Design a protein with these regions (language model features):
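Walker A/P-loop
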Residues: 13-54
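Short loop/turn elements that form and flank the Walker-type P-loop nucleotide-binding site
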Residues: 17-19, 55, 79, 85-87, ...
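Conserved NTP-binding/hydrolysis module of P-loop NTPases
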Residues: 42-48, 52-72
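Short glycine/proline-enriched coil/turn segments at helix->beta-strand junctions
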Residues: 44-46, 88, 112
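Pre-Walker A adenine-sensing motif
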Residues: 4-15, 81
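Buried, small/hydrophobic-residue-enriched core segments of structured protein domains
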Residues: 2-4, 97
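Canonical AAA+ ATPase core
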Residues: 27-30, 34, 64-79, 90-106, ...
Length: 150
């Protein structure tokens, strides 16, 4: 692994929330896997590291109404989404070059405010979301790239 790549992994491990994340433009390959393994090893023990499916729904990402708990409680009960669940952790976003502008805006807002505001289904909640985003941009050509807003 080249020195610059290792330095970037080390910097991200020292202050992941402060840096917000990294865009890693590389195809799925051994070098990329080695960099991700290095980052995992350098992060403090117990730091959550989760993959984000490209087609994740807004409810799974942001949260929403927990229908079962709402019916049982007789009042609206919020279900936290992945962005709130990942507070203090690292999210791996594979195929970031395929991310929609709307999804990029959601991630960007969370990175900027370090919180998730859930306003839907009669809910109005704010959850801490101090996370780090590792965007894996696997674009094969110059016109395939992740949204510039990230």
């Amino acid at each position: 692994m080249q020195g610059e790549a290792a330095t970037i992994a080390a910097l991200l491990a020292v202050d992941p929330v402060g840096l917000g994340g990294v865009a890693l433009r590389a195809p799925a390959c051994a070098e990329r896997d080695a960099w991700l393994a290095l980052l995992r090893d350098l992060l403090p023990r117990g730091t959550p590291l989760r993959r984000v499916p490209l087609n994740i729904s807004d409810t799974a990402l942001l949260g929403g109404l927990d229908l079962g708990a709402t019916l049982q409680a007789g009042r609206p009960v919020a279900l936290q989404g992945l962005l709130a669940q990942a507070d203090g952790g690292v999210l791996l976003l594979a195929m970031a070059e395929r991310m929609t502008a709307a999804a990029a805006a959601r991630f960007g807002s969370v990175l900027d405010t370090r919180s998730v505001r859930l306003q839907r289904d009669g809910l109005d909640s704010v959850y801490a979301s101090r996370l780090t985003l590792v965007a894996l941009d696997e674009g094969a050509s110059d016109d395939e790239h992740m949204p510039a807003s990230l």
